[in-house]
Every structure is written in C-alpha cells, then in structure tokens.
C-alpha cells in the first residue's frame, strides 16, 4: 500500500503514544516503507525506502526541515560528520554520500562484485575512521570502508544474507544471517537451532 508509512512518538514519562505525528505536523504522508530513523543534533532523519527519500524533521515539532531526494532505495543513514553521511541502498551497487547540511548527494562508494540487480548494503557501524556495512539481499559479505577516502578497503565473507550488524562494548562485530531461501540462485543455508560462533576464528581486522 503506497503512502502507508507513519511515525509515532512514545513518551516514557507518561507512557503514552502519539500516532501520525509526521502527518499532523506536515499535512502529508511519509510515503512507502519508513525503513529506519536516526537522530542527530535534535534532527530526526527518516529513511523512506520505496519512496526514495530521506526526511529531516525537528524532533520537538516533527516538522520537516529538509529532505534528500534522488536516492535509489535507501535503507540506513550513518553520519561521518556534520557535512558528510553515508546512505546504504538496496537494488544498487553504490553507497550514496550525502551532505546533511545541503541535503545534496555529493558522491558514491562503489561496492565490489555487485550489480544493480544484486546490490544491497544495509546497517553501518563505525570504529575509528572505518565504517563496516553488512551486505544483505543476495550477498554474504561485510565491507570495510575508509571514511577518509570513501573507498572499500577490505571485506569479509560470512553466512548468506547478513541482515544486521552491531558492535559490542569490546569492539567486536556481530551479525545475523537469514540464510536466503530454498531455490535461490545465490545460495541457501538451512536454519539450525543452535550455533556457537567463534568470533576469533573468523576475523576482520579493525
């Protein structure tokens, strides 16, 4: 359903929920599939996947203060600085570089061994000057990006279709893979009830 995405606000003090806060503040719908939201400096960045847009909103009034357009199918935004952020995509072999101050696309990071049909980058975490990103749909890799050059400098093969990526307090990366689906030309891994992951045996040097 198009324009089905909504934004709600939960107040932990009163334990109440306000629905449709974006629509009520801006008199327009968010669009189709609000995939993720990141807050930075009192601005919320709402990534709307199928509508190819990122809305910047004031988190106190929920009013739009800007938007980034011209994206393929955005998934997540990660801020490198006040003037540079990365936006991951599905159905694209590139990670977009944007300027949050001007809301403009300023460049691209080309991901190796991807096409427009098989391209997929998802969540991002940062350690020092490096950003790590899991490649989800039809992929099985984690990429390492140097933020000073905006280039992929290393990669690690993991299980099929890593869906998420986090870094723990000991600076270790953890990912979850969904294994694809039976009959997929890109591979399939049967689910198991228990897996012991020895992180020290499969390592991507930070």
Feature roles, as predicted:
Residues 13, 58-61, 99-103, 146-150:
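Short loop/turn segments that connect beta-strands within beta-propeller blades
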Residues 3-6, 96, 140-143, 183-194:
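Structural motif
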Residues 32-36, 73-78, 118-123, 160-168:
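Repeated scaffold domains used in trafficking and secretory/extracellular systems
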Residues 70-80, 88-96, 100, 105-125:
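Asp-box/WD-like beta-propeller blade repeats and closely related beta-sheet repeat scaffolds
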Residues 17-28, 63-68, 104-114, 151-156, ...:
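A short beta-strand motif characteristic of beta-propeller blades
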Residues 39-41, 80-82, 126-128, 168-170:
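Residue-level detector of Asp-centered blade-edge/turn motifs that repeat once per structural unit
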Residues 195-202:
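Conserved small/polar residues in nucleotide/adenosyl-binding loops
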Residues 1-3, 45-50, 87-91, 133-137, ...:
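Conserved beta-strand positions in repeat-built beta-propeller and related beta-rich domains
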């Amino acid at each position: 359903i198009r324009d089905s995405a909504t934004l709600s606000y939960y107040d932990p003090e009163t334990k109440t929920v306000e629905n449709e806060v974006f629509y009520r503040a801006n008199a327009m719908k968010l669009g189709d599939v609000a995939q993720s939201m990141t807050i930075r400096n009192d601005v919320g960045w709402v990534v709307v996947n199928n509508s190819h847009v990122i809305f910047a909103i004031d988190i106190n009034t929920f009013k739009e203060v800007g938007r980034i357009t011209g994206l393929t199918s955005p998934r997540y935004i990660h801020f490198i600085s006040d003037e540079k952020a990365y936006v991951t995509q599905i159905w694209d072999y590139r990670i977009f570089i944007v300027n949050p101050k001007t809301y403009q696309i300023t460049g691209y990071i080309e991901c190796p061994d991807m096409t427009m049909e098989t391209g997929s980058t998802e969540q991002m975490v940062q350690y020092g000057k490096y950003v790590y990103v899991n490649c989800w749909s039809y992929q099985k890799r984690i990429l390492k990006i140097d933020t000073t050059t905006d280039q992929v400098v290393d990669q690690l093969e993991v299980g099929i279709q890593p869906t998420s990526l986090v870094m723990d307090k000991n600076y270790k990366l953890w990912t979850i893979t969904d294994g694809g689906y039976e009959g997929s030309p890109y591979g399939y891994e049967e689910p198991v009830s228990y897996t012991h992951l020895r992180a020290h045996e499969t390592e991507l040097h930070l």
